[in-house]
């Protein structure tokens, strides 16, 4: 019996290791054939890291944790290798974005074992772990452009694991770990923190409704618990104000929803689709249908399996279902919906753990097969991703510095995402056209505007702009 138990444990850890390695390899393959980093806004990360290493501050206002991690990795690579500094920074960003998000499998692994009491079948375990890191959000969308999104999902899963442990064991140290994981999420990505904040509110409300007597009894056992929990709740409420220190613009955007909460339903995704004002390609439409189908299914399954669960399990699962429905709700603002839809794979992954634990085989097996096929398709089609600019464009963009007088007191404006490449290659202050007002122009000796000719979606060139340089791939205009 002992040998059998050891073998089962070895198989589970083998699956954990294998899925983690597959995730790292797939994420590395996405960037392996690129002279820099593929994706539209991917140069944002090396640029921020370079600013940290050279000046000790970020070049653009943002929550800092990911850039701190990447800067530390870059510093180590610079010290132990002969690679040029720029190459070391780019390599560090690639490495961090490949390895850290793949660590998601660890909290998901232990959460799965805890929910299933270490009795889950290896095949189901493999599907759950694969769903956590090989899904379209983490593997495709967040593989190259969105380091912060992918890494913050790791901290969200950590929060869910420790919250699950606390809801079952009521140990204060687990509540401390919840608080720490929430803080890490906030310092990594505002969107994921906002989504996690919603879940914590839902979980607190559901727990208060269905388990108030047990909570009161737990508090009576130790007076210090009341103080600690009150302090934790106060800290959670005040956490969003920490965002103001790093990104005042996002903080003001968050506050606007408290003054006008109904704006979240304006220009909803569902309404724009019905009016024919929004078009999606078939892949995104299929993704939407799959997510919302699972959302509806999770509600139905709750009423079928809740009697097989204890009170804590039922509360946690119901909170996940409500969270999942809120994140995948097509009746909210389209811009918000597009972001939340991809984060909704977090509750889907954890809900799947409960489905495999409490549903019967006729339900478990088809779901496992469907998920396995979808994940296989995702991995098979992930592949190598292209950069925002070609090698030839990169070389020409770099050469523009020779035609810019007084670069230290010049700002070069560009279309969104191109400004990061401009600042990286020219080592010059850069921004978006809409981000600099005309009354701010006198701060600089000159204000330039660079146009990438291959971009199919060009902004309108300012009427007062004069062409000062034209090349094969870029035109340079003077605005002021």
PLM ranges: what are they?
Residues 134-137, 355-357, 365-389:
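Transmembrane alpha-helical segments
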Residues 19-24, 46, 66, 93-115, ...:
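Membrane-embedded helix bundles of polyisoprenyl
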